[in-house]
Amino acid sequence: GEQDVVSTILQADMDRLRHTNEHLAREAFSGAVEALLQARCIYVLGVRSSAALASSLSYYLHYMFETVRLITTPSTSEVFEQLVRISPQDAVIGISFPRYSTATGKALQYCREAGAQVIALTDSETAPIARSAHYLLTAKSDMVSLVDSLVAPMSVVNALIVALTSRRKHETAQTLERLEQVWDQYHVYEKVHI
């Protein structure tokens, strides 16, 4: 029944999280954090189901860094149009899980050849984008009938955000303070009095 589906999926996701925790290379994770901290511009690339992960990462990076570019178009030509100015002062994090996007693979190869720091978040060392990565972050992801399980990859994204936030406390606090003022002034959010 439906209860069994819930238990089965949640248990499988817990297993994926455990596997990811045991196999994620901590040196690569630390290197990725440093590369992002040093970058002039951060490009975040993820298409199809990986676009959700890229969007979430990009959303939080905007609180910490001035120049963040999110690329989620599945069009290979548009991906290259958005990456054409990447330089050795920049970093890109590409996210790709099966079925692997050829656009993401080609784009990361281009970024590496352009001298940028390349971070790849994918499911294994043999994934197509792994070849272009300076820093390879792996997270277990399996197809569950129609859907990809992105729980473990999202957890790695969350860990990156927390690690970066702890290193950019001042910048993040300043941004949030300014945003709170703007939100109040322009009534962006409803205030609920309890």
Question: Where on the chain are the PLM-derived regions?
Answer:
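Glycine-rich phosphate-binding loops that contact phosphosugars or nucleotide phosphates
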Residues: 40-155, 159-168
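Short, charged beta->alpha transition segments
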Residues: 4, 27-32, 78-81
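Glycine-rich phosphate/diphosphate-binding loops that line cofactor/substrate pockets in enzymes
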Residues: 27-40, 86
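A short, charged, Gly/Pro-tolerant segment at domain boundaries
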Residues: 170-194
